[in-house]
C-alpha cells in the first residue's frame, strides 16, 4: 500500500482518502504479507464489515453497505493491478477473480418543496451555518464534501467554482445574489467545518424518512430531480453535476415533464403529413 501511494496514489485527486482507507483495511486484515493475501481472507473480512464486527466510523457501527464493501474491494484490487503495471508486482492479483456483491438499482429519494422548507427551518434552528451548507447543496447540486470544503477563492460574484472534484474537473455553477451575499458575509478563507453529524441529528428530528445511505446525497438528488421536473436539459444537468458518463445523469430523465410523452408526439405515425395520416388510419395505400 505504501509503495502504491508513493508511485501512483498520491497523484490521484482522492489518493490520500483512498490511502487512509487502505491502511484501515490492511490493519483490519491483520497486515498480512502481500503474497499471503487470498480471496478467502478478504471474503471473511467483508463478512465482518457487513455485520459491523469491523467498522471504521461510528456511522457504520451497524455494518457497512455492500456498495461500500465493493468499493473497498476495488481499492485493494487496484493496488495489485497498478503495481503490476509498474513492474513492482509479479504475482497474480489475489482479488482478480473475486466477484463483488450484486447491487440492485437503489431508490433515489428527493425532497418535496414542503420537506425542503421543513429541513431548512430545522437546520437554521440548530445552526445557521449548517443551513447555509444545505442551501449550497440544494442550489448547486454539490456533493456534501464539495460544499463543506468551499473556500473564499472559489466564490466569485454570483458563481461558485468547485475544484478537486470527484470527476476531476472543475465546474462553475451560478448562484443567486442572496446566496452569494450570505456566503461572503462569513469570515475566513475556509468557510465551514464538516457538520455531517449535526445534519444527521437534525434529519432524525424531522418527518423526512430516507433510504439508507442517502443522508447528505439526498440534497444532490433533490437538485437534480427538481431541475428535471422544471424542464431542465439532461445534458446541462450532466455538466452541472459533473458526471463523466451520461448514464449516471439519465437516472433523472424520467422526472422530466415530457418524458415518454414525446413518444406520442414523435412516433412515425404522429409525424406523417396530415393527408398520409388519414390514409394510414383507413388502411389506404397512398
PLM regions: where:
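Short, aromatic/basic-rich helix-turn unit that serves as a nucleic-acid recognition element
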Residues: 1-22
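Short, basic (Lys/Arg/His-rich) helix/loop patches that form interaction surfaces
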Residues: 32, 121-131, 140, 173, ...
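C-terminal secondary-structure termini that scaffold catalytic or DNA-interacting sites
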Residues: 267-286
Amino acid at each position: 500500500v505504501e509503495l502504491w501511494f508513493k508511485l501512483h496514489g498520491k497523484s490521484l485527486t482522492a489518493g490520500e482518502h483512498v490511502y487512509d482507507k487502505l491502511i484501515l483495511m490492511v490493519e483490519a486484515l491483520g497486515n498480512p504479507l502481500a503474497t499471503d493475501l487470498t480471496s478467502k481472507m478478504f471474503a471473511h473480512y467483508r463478512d465482518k464489515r457487513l455485520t459491523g464486527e469491523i467498522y471504521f466510523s461510528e456511522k457504520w457501527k451497524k455494518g457497512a453497505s455492500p456498495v461500500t464493501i465493493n468499493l473497498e474491494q476495488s481499492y485493494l484490487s487496484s493496488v495489485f493491478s497498478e503495481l503490476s503495471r509498474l513492474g513492482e508486482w509479479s504475482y497474480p492479483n489475489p482479488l482478480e477473480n473475486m466477484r463483488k456483491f450484486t447491487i440492485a438499482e437503489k431508490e433515489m429519494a428527493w425532497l418535496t418543496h414542503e420537506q425542503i422548507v421543513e429541513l431548512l427551518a430545522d437546520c437554521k434552528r440548530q445552526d445557521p451555518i449548517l443551513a447555509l451548507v444545505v442551501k449550497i447543496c440544494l442550489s448547486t447540486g454539490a456533493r456534501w464534501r464539495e460544499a463543506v470544503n468551499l473556500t473564499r477563492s472559489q466564490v466569485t460574484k454570483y458563481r461558485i467554482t468547485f475544484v478537486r472534484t470527484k470527476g476531476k474537473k472543475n465546474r462553475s455553477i451560478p448562484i443567486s445574489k442572496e446566496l452569494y451575499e450570505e456566503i461572503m458575509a462569513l469570515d475566513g478563507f475556509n468557510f465551514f467545518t464538516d457538520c455531517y453529524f449535526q445534519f444527521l441529528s437534525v434529519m432524525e428530528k424531522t418527518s423526512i424518512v430516507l433510504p439508507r445511505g442517502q443522508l447528505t446525497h439526498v440534497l444532490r438528488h433533490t437538485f437534480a430531480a427538481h431541475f428535471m421536473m422544471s424542464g431542465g436539459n439532461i445534458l446541462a444537468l450532466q455538466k452541472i453535476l459533473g458526471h463523466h458518463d451520461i448514464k449516471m445523469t439519465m437516472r433523472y430523465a424520467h422526472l422530466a415533464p415530457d418524458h415518454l410523452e414525446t413518444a406520442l408526439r414523435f412516433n412515425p405515425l404522429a409525424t406523417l403529413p396530415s393527408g398520409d395520416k388519414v390514409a394510414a388510419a383507413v388502411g389506404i395505400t397512398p
